Amino acid sequence: MKHCFVALFLGSTAMASVKPLTYYQDEWGEDGDDLREALYDIIRVHTRLTYSSSSTDTWDVLKVSDADPTNATNVMLIYAGIPVNGPQEYNNNQGWTREHVWPKSLGGFGTSAGVGTDVHNLKPCNGGLNSLRSNHEYDELGTGGSPVNFNGSATGSRYNGSAGLFEPRDDIKGDLARIILYMDLRYEGQGGEPDLILLDSLHSFCNSFSLISSLFYFHFPFSFFSFFFLIFFFFVFILF
């Protein structure tokens, strides 16, 4: 079930990566399981940070990675889409929190150095919206569910608590989809790490996240051009 994400991962990196071509040279010519293993070997080596400490931690990285492009002192809140002062951090829930895009409870991990502090999976978030999203999986809700508001204004997100579903606002759907796809590829159950698996059925079992079809849709803006990429990746998935 994991093979399709290799093609999707490569497609997104080929179009968006600023790394030299040599970064992925070890996987050229590979396919299927061999390709997935080659990519895993490349991305599994990275700096492990502590969740919170007096030295460089995940707070510090998010202040840079998610800085407001118009004011670097602020960070952008992922679901609200507005800036907030970065240095204040949590500040008794008056500041911001760190959202695990792949929820801890759906991955069997906490906040120990490793998967729980992988900043690829962390985003600044308002505490209330962090709690509202909870561990809901991502899907398109259309006009269903309820709108997500922040400070009296609509954010563009929606949620359905009884169904355990959350639809992010359009501007961030692609980013969140690629984070989830990265987590599926990066965490394979090696060295005591969890084996994270993407599925297309909701609430399947521990260490899984859904829905594949919605993440594909989130990743590609649905235009004439991207339609052919979407068909291509589904074709590759079937072949694998």
Language model regions located:
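Sec-dependent signal peptide recognition
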Residues: 1-7
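Low-complexity, intrinsically disordered or signal/transmembrane-proximal segments
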Residues: 3, 217-219
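N-terminal signal peptide c-region/cleavage motif recognized by signal peptidases
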Residues: 11-13
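N-terminal module-boundary/linker segments of secreted carbohydrate-active enzymes
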Residues: 15-81
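Short alpha-helical segments and helix-capping/turn motifs at coil-helix boundaries
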Residues: 56-64, 82-84, 106-111, 163-167
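Short, His- and charge-rich active-site/binding loops that engage polyanionic ligands
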Residues: 75-77, 81-95
